Amino acid sequence: MLPPNVTGGLFWHWQAWRSAALWRPTVEALEFWLKLQTKDTRSEALVIIGASAGWMMPIDWLCQFKEVHTFDIDPLAAPLFRWRHGKKLRQNGTALTCLTQNALSDLPSLLKAHPQACIFFDNVLGQLRFTESGVQLAEKNISQIVQCLKGREWGSVHDRMSGPVNGALKLGGDDKALCPERPGHLDKSVDAQTWLSSINAQSPWLDHLTGNVFDKNTAVHNVDWAFKPNYWHWLQAGWVRP
């Protein structure tokens, strides 16, 4: 879904592969959250926008659906997604279609092509600030995407902020401090500061312009992601039901 120099290309996939142990606590936290969101869904199809190779996609969650359709602009994403998840999905009877395509270039047509599917944005909305020419344009595009999804079941996990940490938190093992989690929008500065302080965040942290993706009626879950030992991302997750 993103240009290869952002979250695609050979180096990105190599980095994701070698970071599996570091990322595992976040993947496990997201798996629990995702299963909770779709346990009562009536949709049998899932569309993943910005799927990459599914490095953080829990296979057991994917197997809940009869169809999985992935979209990503990175030409390596589709074959690597099939390599990582294809066999298990086939064994489960889940049909997998992986397309190399910019799904956001014509989102209305994609929604019409998959009228009953759940739509999931896999860490893509927070990257739009890097692919657009300015902050205002990125914010406008995010708002237009959200408007386009009215009446649909959809979810997103995306970067809310990212930045350096002082490395004091222990990495590895089963330590719950590895992956701090907290519900709520955290839209008040004091709440955000408390959250960032809990992971020893060091200024400056980058705002990914996703603070208004979800309205106040949508339950939001926050998860930290140790992208690198000394550089973490604050992930915001939410699921919208029609």
Model segments located where?
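Conserved SAM-binding loop of SAM-dependent methyltransferases across substrates and taxa
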Residues: 52-65
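Conserved class I S-adenosyl-L-methionine
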Residues: 42-54
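Class I SAM-dependent methyltransferase Rossmann-like catalytic core
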Residues: 1-43
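A short SAM/SAH-binding and catalytic strip from SAM-dependent methyltransferases
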Residues: 110, 116-135
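Conserved SAM/SAH-binding beta-strand->alpha-helix loop
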Residues: 74
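Conserved beta-strand signature within the Rossmann-like core of class I S-adenosyl-L-methionine
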Residues: 120-121, 141-144, 148-162
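S-adenosyl-L-methionine
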Residues: 83-113
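Charged, low-complexity C-terminal accessory regions
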Residues: 162-242
